[in-house]
Amino acid sequence: MFIYEPLTGDGARVYRGLRVALEFKKAGDDVRVVFDGSGVEALAGIAHPGDKRHSLLMELGNSVDGACGYCAVAHKVKDQIVGAGFALLDDDDGEVSVRRYVNEGYTVLNF
């Protein structure tokens, strides 16, 4: 599950991405959540306990792999993401590798 959407606007795509991931997790599926592109801003925002989507993030727990390292730096949210305990993913020349997830057998859904 890749979330590319920032929280600007209503944040509905971020919410749906988290809910769909949680649906898979509750069904016993191996689901991974990655925040990429502008979506790194969403992770920085929902990592804050005051955000209304924070509880969904906590329910997903270790299913959240983290955020694109390059994007986190570019969007100036690296410190918030790392400070909240999430990993920066940089396995493709500093960016997160979507190909790795495909090669590991995951179906990639984008929100």
Residue ranges of predicted features:
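Structural motif
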Residues: M1-I3, V31-R32, V64-G66, T107-V108
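Short, glycine-rich nucleotide/cofactor-binding loops
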Residues: M1-Y15, V40-I46
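Histidine-anchored nucleotide/phosphate-binding helix
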Residues: R13-A27
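Hydrophobic/aromatic ligand-binding patch that stacks against planar heteroaromatic rings
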Residues: V20-E23, L57, Q80, R100-Y101
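Short internal beta-strands
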Residues: A21, V31-G37, D65-C71
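Glycine-rich loop at the start of a catalytic domain that most often binds anionic cofactors/ligands
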Residues: L43-G50, Q80
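A glycine-rich helix N-cap at a beta->alpha junction
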Residues: P49-V77
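C-terminal structural segments of small proteins and small subunits
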Residues: D79-F111
